[in-house]
């Protein structure tokens, strides 16, 4: 038996609250209605689409994790983080990131993505870049997506130093690599 619109919308809200990563297709199947009906219900209830719900959940969990800088100061979007171990961020190269004459990304944006990821990775409220050895291996163009992967390769809390290796890729092709020596407070 089909539920009334009001009942369906109440159940839809409950379902999305308990399982925020459920797709519109799965919801349509669960409630035996069309995908368009689910989308209209979400719109009426001001429930964001799946991608926005995922982003919101990720931001909430990362806000509690990142200690060394506010999330809005990270260049790119952190999608994975394990403090003092590894992290991944994504940066969409848009018009504001490139030279207008050739649409090639300015190097400082790639450096900033890698450096801010290295800072965010540190499990300490104080994290500063002491030294960086970087290499740009190919040009990045407007419209490309840069995925930066950082991992801690050496951790010395007694000396207050952490070495972080960051490699950035566009479609699995290396575009940037760097080794960052990070200063951290000795009390963490």
UniProtKB/Swiss-Prot annotation:
Keywords: DNA-binding, Fatty acid biosynthesis, Fatty acid metabolism, Lipid biosynthesis, Lipid metabolism, Repressor, Transcription, Transcription regulation. One of its GO terms (molecular function) is DNA binding. The keyword Transcription regulation applies. One of its GO terms (biological process) is negative regulation of fatty acid biosynthetic process. InterPro entries: HotDog_dom_sf, Thioestr_dom, Transcription_factor_FapR, WH-like_DNA-bd_sf, WH_DNA-bd_sf. The keyword Lipid biosynthesis applies. It comes from the Bacteria. Belongs to the FapR family. Transcriptional factor involved in regulation of membrane lipid biosynthesis by repressing genes involved in fatty acid and phospholipid metabolism. This is Transcription factor FapR. The gene is fapR.
């Amino acid at each position: 038996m089909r539920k009334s619109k009001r009942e369906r919308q109440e159940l839809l809200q409950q379902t999305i609250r308990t399982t925020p990563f459920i797709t519109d297709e799965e919801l349509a199947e669960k409630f035996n209605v069309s995908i368009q009906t689910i989308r209209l219900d979400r719109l009426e209830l001001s429930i964001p689409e799946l991608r926005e719900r995922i982003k919101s959940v990720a931001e909430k969990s990362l806000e509690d994790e990142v200690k060394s800088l506010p999330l809005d100061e990270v260049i790119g979007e952190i999608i994975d983080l394990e403090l003092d171990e590894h992290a991944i961020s994504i940066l969409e190269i848009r018009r504001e990131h490139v030279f207008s004459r050739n649409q090639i990304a300015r190097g400082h944006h790639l450096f900033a993505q890698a450096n801010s990821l290295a800072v965010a990775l540190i499990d300490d409220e104080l994290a500063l870049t002491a030294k960086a050895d970087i290499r740009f291996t190919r040009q990045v163009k407007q419209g490309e997506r840069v995925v930066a992967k950082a991992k801690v390769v050496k951790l010395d809390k007694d000396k207050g130093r952490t070495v972080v290796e960051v490699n950035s890729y566009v479609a699995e092709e290396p575009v940037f690599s760097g080794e960052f020596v990070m200063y951290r407070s000795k009390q963490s």
